[in-house]
């Protein structure tokens, strides 16, 4: 091999055919018959979220280290991420595109981390002042009422909250055990909401006694009802009332109040929802042997899957296809509960197969306590003289919670029946937004059909398969010693590791692929976005192919 020759300048090079001019004179854009354009879609996770949180946005901001703006992105649609990050049934994860590649992003864990950061940094919260003279009344201080009050206050409306209990929170305080949702977290969220704007509170305000709907309607510009469901549904069987049988909701209320409970050595819980799981796990913490009896199978259980798995991990036994028919007592000792064996028949209105008796097959369980947790009921009687009701629920005319009276709105479980915390939060926000438009005369926002993507639109060549980062937790043995919170939350390293897994579906996250790969140098990289230089883009669509997240679409030239 010959000696290496180094040229200090092109002038030292021997004569050869070469070009030292640029090609800007050649407007290759004239060759184009299709043009690319940046086209941001709605990520599937956001479409799955009942509060429509901009999940892609706040996870991207986490990867950038901008926690304050990430928290503010959540607060736009959900004022209590510290709570929903702990107790939501996270349908967003079911929609997460990454689950079709490896495992869904742990969205609730990221949401919880940001929610806790927001509580630790109260200066992040916008402190709204009263800018409107119209006063709004909110009845109930559960998730729907708190959400409605927050978003009304953020618009500048003075809000008065009426709560029958001695403390705010509703189901957040009394219906969810501390090992899932610590009282301290509830207290901090409520304090944050009350400090966010012109909100005053009146506790011990009992409907029909201290306040009435017709009076509030006269005194306030608008009223929102978010009282939730307050009663356990009865089973309607012989012996249901009496010693040895207790409503699940009442038991949870005692536990959350810190009262001493002793359900006995053997306990059966009837039901398959989250309340049943909560009651069973609280009873285990009292030292009881617990069996949950459900009339359908595991597949039909309405409880959050994670809660079922946690209950089993803590030693709760599950017995399926059985329903209680009678309860017998002899003195003050254990009770005998007779169960009918069931089988699944045709689907009912919920889409689940209806349980029907399996002939004459029965069995008996002898237990110290039976807890009933077959659902909750509302009480619409305080409102039926003023607005239309539907049995034990309030009738509404839209997702915004409008009732038969134009100034009265309702939302949450008192409208839908038993649902979730996050759905109640969404109902409260939508009602607040509608009330604001009603009082200002603003028009309704135009409805747009959201465009989204699926795994087929993701260029997975740019991603490595990784496992979801799990939230650290205490062991089952340690958990049963008390009501300490089970999941301890992400630290900064785990938070970033999980956020970095996000595909950022349909939304540019400035990865530079289009800028790097464009053969015509027709992508201009600006401070906060990219632009196509259509004088030189010849429509080769390399940018579309190499975009990892389908944030670029195409349009036929001339259209």
What annotation goes with each model-predicted range?
Residues 1-135, 183, 225-241, 329-334, ...:
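Ferredoxin-type iron-sulfur electron-transfer modules and their immediate structural context
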Residues 232-241, 259-321, 326, 415-455:
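Rossmann-like dinucleotide-binding core of oxidoreductases
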Residues 161, 410-411:
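Generic enzyme active-site microenvironment
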Residues 135, 158, 265-266, 407:
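Residues that mark the start of a beta-strand
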Residues 139-143, 271-273, 413:
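Glycine-rich Rossmann-fold phosphate-binding loop(s) that bind the pyrophosphate
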Residues 11, 18-22, 26, 52-63, ...:
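Beta1-alpha1 glycine-rich phosphate/pyrophosphate-binding loop at the start
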Residues 114-128, 249-262, 267:
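Short internal alpha-helix immediately C-terminal to a glycine-rich phosphate-binding loop
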Residues 184-234, 246-263, 285-391:
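A Rossmann-like FAD-binding core segment of flavoenzymes
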């Amino acid at each position: 091999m010959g000696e290496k020759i180094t040229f200090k300048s092109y002038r030292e090079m021997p004569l050869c055919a070469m070009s030292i001019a640029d090609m800007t004179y050649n407007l290759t854009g004239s060759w184009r018959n299709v043009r690319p354009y940046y086209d941001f879609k709605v990520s599937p996770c956001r479409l799955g979220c009942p509060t429509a949180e901009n999940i892609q946005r706040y996870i991207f901001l986490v990867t950038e280290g901008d926690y304050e703006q990430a928290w503010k992105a959540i607060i736009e649609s959900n004022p209590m991420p510290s709570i929903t990050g702990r107790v939501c049934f996270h349908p967003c994860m079911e929609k997460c595109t990454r689950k079709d590649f490896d495992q869904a992003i742990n969205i609730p864990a990221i949401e919880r981390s940001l929610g806790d950061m927001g509580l630790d940094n109260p200066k992040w919260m916008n402190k709204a002042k009263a800018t409107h003279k119209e006063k709004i009344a909110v009845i109930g201080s559960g998730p729907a009422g708190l959400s409605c009050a927050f978003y009304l206050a953020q618009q500048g409306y003075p809000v008065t909250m009426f709560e029958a209990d001695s403390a705010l929170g509703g189901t957040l305080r009394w219906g969810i055990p501390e090992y899932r949702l610590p009282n301290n977290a509830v207290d901090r969220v409520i304090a944050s909401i009350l400090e966010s704007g012109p909100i005053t509170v009146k506790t011990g305000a009992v409907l029909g006694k201290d306040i009435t709907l017709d009076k509030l309607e006269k005194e306030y510009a608008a009223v929102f009802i978010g009282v939730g469901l307050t009663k356990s549904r009865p089973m309607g069987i012989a012996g249901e009332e009496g010693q040895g049988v207790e409503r699940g909701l009442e038991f949870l209320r005692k536990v959350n109040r810190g009262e001493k409970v002793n359900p006995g050595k053997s306990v059966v819980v009837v039901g398959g929802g989250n309340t049943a799981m909560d009651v069973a796990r609280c009873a285990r913490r009292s030292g009881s042997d617990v069996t949950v009896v459900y009339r359908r199978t595991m597949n039909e259980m309405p409880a959050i899957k994670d809660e079922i798995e946690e209950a089993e991990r803590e030693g709760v036994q599950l017995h399926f296809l059985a329903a209680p028919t009678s309860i017998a007592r002899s003195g003050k000792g254990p009770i005998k509960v007779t169960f009918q064996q069931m089988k699944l028949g045709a689907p009912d209105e919920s889409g689940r197969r209806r349980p029907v008796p399996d002939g004459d097959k029965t069995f008996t369980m002898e237990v110290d306590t039976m807890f009933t947790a077959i659902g909750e009921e509302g009480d619409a009687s305080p409102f039926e003289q003023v607005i239309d009701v539907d049995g034990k629920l309030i009738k509404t005319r839209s997702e915004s919670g409008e009732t038969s009276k134009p100034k009265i709105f309702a939302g949450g479980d008192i409208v839908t029946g038993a649902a979730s915390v996050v759905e109640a939060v969404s109902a409260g926000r939508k009602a607040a937004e509608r009330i604001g438009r009603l009082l200002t005369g603003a028009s309704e926002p135009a409805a747009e059909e959201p465009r989204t993507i699926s795994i087929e639109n993701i260029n997975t060549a740019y991603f490595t398969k990784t496992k979801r980062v799990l939230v650290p937790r205490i062991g089952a043995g340690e958990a049963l010693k008390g009501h300490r919170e089970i999941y301890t939350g992400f630290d900064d390293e785990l938070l970033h590791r999980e956020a970095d897994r996000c595909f950022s579906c349909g939304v540019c996250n400035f990865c530079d692929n289009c800028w790097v790969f464009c053969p015509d140098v027709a992508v201009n990289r600006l401070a906060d976005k990219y632009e196509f230089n259509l004088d030189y883009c010849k429509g080769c669509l390399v940018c579309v192919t190499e975009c990892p997240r389908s944030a670029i679409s195409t349009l036929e030239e001339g259209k």
